[in-house]
Amino acid sequence: MQNFGAQEMRKGRLAFVRLSKLETLQNLIDKMLAERVFNKGEAADILESNDIRADIARALIDSVTKKGDVACSLFAGAIARQDVVLADAMGISQV
């Protein structure tokens, strides 16, 4: 997996918001909890504060981006394993 930092994540934001599915978003939040990128409160806030799928996607990618390059790299890897089409649209590639 290439190094995929905050700058690259910001470039892929529109594709993420437009193409991500609710199930994928929930799985990604679970993965970020498991990787300790988020705590339970942060994860709950993303889901409970947003009713629309696109708003959940925005909150999720913005929260990860604020956490920095390491968090973005973990997130990119999780996206690549969950949804190849989404990863490709965001410019995430497997090496």
From Swiss-Prot:
This is Caspase recruitment domain-containing protein 064R. The lineage of its organism: Viruses, Varidnaviria, Bamfordvirae, Nucleocytoviricota, Megaviricetes. It comes from Frog virus 3 (isolate Goorha). InterPro entries: CARD, DEATH-like_dom_sf. Residues 1-94 form the CARD domain. One of its GO terms (biological process) is regulation of apoptotic process. Pfam families: CARD (PF00619).
